[in-house]
Amino acid sequence: MVTGTDERLERFRAEFLPKLVTAFRPTVVMAFGSRIRGEGLAHSDLDLVIVSDSFRNIRWLDRPGCVIEALGLKFGVDLFCYTPEEYARKREEFGVVRTACQEGVPLITEPST
């Protein structure tokens, strides 16, 4: 189990979040899942919800790969990438986004400027 401050989350914040902001200008980035609950193992991935207008013209299934490639991520992540409209709908449904909103740690919660 990962204890204390999660190294993967802190590495993402320091190294990759600035790149994400530059490349995709997200309005919401939320970390959630086993690492955030303190239940993650050393090999557990980092679960992230990312909301950006930049995803509008990218197929839903292609979005995570685009983010991983643009940021040069070298460790396990599970990315859920939505447009603002998709995110607004998903927040009201039972599922990943609702869970992330309930238990997640916001990394970005307002529009990027």
Mark where each language-model region is.
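Catalytic core of pol beta-like nucleotidyltransferases
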Residues: 1-28, 36-43, 52-113
